[in-house]
Design a protein with these regions (language model features):
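Exposed aromatic-hydrophobic patches
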Residues: 7, 119-131, 269-272, 282-294, ...
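Solvent-exposed loop/turn and edge beta-strand elements of beta-rich ligand-binding domains
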Residues: 1-5, 85, 95-97, 232, ...
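Short helix-loop boundary/capping segments
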Residues: 180-197, 201, 205-287, 296-298
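Short, low-hydrophobicity acidic/polar segments
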Residues: 2-226, 306, 325-327
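Exposed, polar/acidic Ser/Thr-rich sequence context and nearby capping/turn residues
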Residues: 220-221, 294-338
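Low-complexity, acidic Ser/Thr/Pro-rich "mucin-like" tracts of secreted and single-pass surface proteins
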Residues: 24-30, 39, 271, 275, ...
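Short, surface-exposed linear segments at secondary-structure transitions and domain or protein termini
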Residues: 116-121, 254-257, 322-334
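Surface-exposed loop/edge segments in extracytoplasmic proteins
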Residues: 96-111, 240-245, 310-319
Length: 338
C-alpha cells in the first residue's frame, strides 16, 4: 500500500437521536396523526385469579437518554460531550467496487483518542496516511475501544469484507455500556484533502447499537395507594450476539443473537423499596439495561414483587413479552399499572 503525506485523523459528529415523546408500542395512529391505543396495548398479569390485577404497558421512545457526566461504562451517550475517551477503527483501502475480498490494509482495530492540543481524534502510538495508489477508503468504527469482558472484534486483519463485532452483555447492570457503531460511506482517497474534510478529519457519526430498557409506574388505583415495589426481574435474556458493522435497508445494524444455552443468557434482578406512585421511575441512569435489539422469540418474562409478598417464592405478578420488538437505538420503558 503506497501512502501519501496526509495523516488520517477523525472528527466525531453529533449524530445521536434525541429522546422524543413516548409512544405505546401497541399504539396505532389515527387519520389525524394522533396516537390511538389499541385495547391490547396493556398486558394483564398471568395470574387469572388476581383480585387486583397488575397491567403492563410497553412504551417506546426515540433515542437513548444521556447524562451530563464523563463517559465511562454504564453511561448512555447523547452527544460528543458525553463521548468515550477512545474508539476503535479499521480502514480498508481498495480500488473498483467494494467486495468481500477487501481487507483492513490501512488500519486494523486501531485505538483512536482525542488530542488535547489539536482537539482532533488521532490514532494512538503512530500516524497513518491516506493512500495514493487506491481509489477508495472505507472506515468502520466502534466505541468504546475497551469493551466488556467477552466482547471483541471478531474479524481479523486477514479477513475480508464487512467486519463483525461480538458483544457480551455484562451481568452487572452498572458495567453495561452504550455500544456505538460508525459506518460512513466510502471516501475517494484522492479527493480527501481538496474536497472533503480539510483540516478537520474524517467525520464519524456514531449510532446506538443497543436498546435501553427501563421500568416505571404508570398509574395506581386509590385502593393500592401506599404499597411499595420490592423487586423487578427480567428473566432469561440473551447476552451474547454478533453485530455486522453495516447498516441495513432501514438504517439499523444486523445482529445475530443465538438462543444459546444458560451460559449465553442471564436474569437481571432489581431489589428495590420504591413507593407504588403514579409516574414513579423505577430504574434509570446506571440502572438502565442495555440489551440487544431484536424481536423476542422465546418465552421471556417480567416478574414483579410488591411489599408483603415473599421474595423467595415464585413472582406473584408475571408478564410474558414474547413477540415484542426491542428497536435499535431506542428506549423501551415497561410501565406498570395497578
Amino acid at each position: 500500500l503506497l501512502t501519501g503525506t496526509d495523516p488520517v485523523c477523525f472528527e466525531v459528529v453529533d449524530g445521536w437521536s434525541k429522546p422524543a415523546a413516548a409512544v405505546p408500542q401497541a399504539a396505532a395512529l389515527g387519520s389525524d396523526g394522533r396516537v390511538r391505543e389499541r385495547p391490547s396495548g396493556a398486558i394483564r398479569e398471568e395470574d387469572a385469579g388476581a383480585e387486583r390485577p397488575m397491567f403492563l404497558e410497553t412504551i417506546v421512545t426515540d433515542g437513548i437518554p444521556g447524562r451530563p457526566q464523563a463517559a465511562t461504562r454504564s453511561v448512555q451517550i447523547e452527544d460528543e460531550a458525553d463521548f468515550y475517551d477512545s474508539f476503535g477503527v479499521s480502514a480498508y483501502a481498495y480500488s473498483g467496487d467494494w467486495n468481500e475480498q477487501c481487507k483492513p490494509n490501512l488500519m486494523y482495530n486501531v485505538r483512536v483518542s482525542r488530542n488535547a492540543v489539536s482537539n482532533r481524534w488521532v490514532p494512538d502510538g503512530r500516524r497513518y496516511f491516506w493512500p495514493k495508489n487506491k481509489e477508495w477508503v472505507r472506515f468502520f468504527a466502534y466505541a468504546p475501544y475497551s469493551l466488556p469482558s467477552g466482547s471483541r472484534l471478531l474479524s481479523t486483519a486477514n479477513d475480508g469484507g464487512i467486519p463483525k463485532i461480538r458483544y457480551r452483555v455484562p451481568a452487572n447492570v452498572t458495567d453495561q455500556i452504550d455500544l456505538l457503531i460508525a459506518t460512513p460511506d466510502a471516501v475517494r482517497s484522492e479527493d480527501y484533502d481538496v474536497l472533503v474534510y480539510p483540516g478537520k478529519g474524517m467525520p464519524l457519526t456514531f449510532r446506538h447499537a443497543l436498546t435501553a430498557i427501563q421500568f416505571r409506574v404508570k398509574s395506581v388505583a386509590e385502593q393500592n395507594s401506599g404499597r411499595r415495589i420490592r423487586r423487578v426481574q427480567l428473566a432469561d435474556i440473551p447476552t451474547t450476539g454478533d453485530c455486522t458493522m453495516q447498516l441495513d435497508a432501514e438504517g439499523g445494524l444486523i445482529w445475530e443473537i443465538p438462543r444459546g444455552t444458560s451460559a449465553t443468557r442471564n436474569t437481571y434482578t432489581f431489589d428495590l423499596d420504591i413507593p407504588l406512585v403514579s409516574g414513579q421511575q423505577i430504574t434509570e441512569g446506571d440502572q438502565t439495561l442495555m440489551m440487544f435489539p431484536h424481536t423476542i422469540q422465546a418465552d421471556l418474562y417480567i416478574h414483579v414483587w410488591l411489599d408483603g409478598e415473599n421474595l423467595d417464592q415464585t413472582a406473584p405478578h408475571s408478564f410474558g413479552i414474547q413477540g415484542q420488538t426491542w428497536p435499535i437505538g431506542k428506549t423501551v420503558t415497561y410501565a406498570f399499572s395497578m
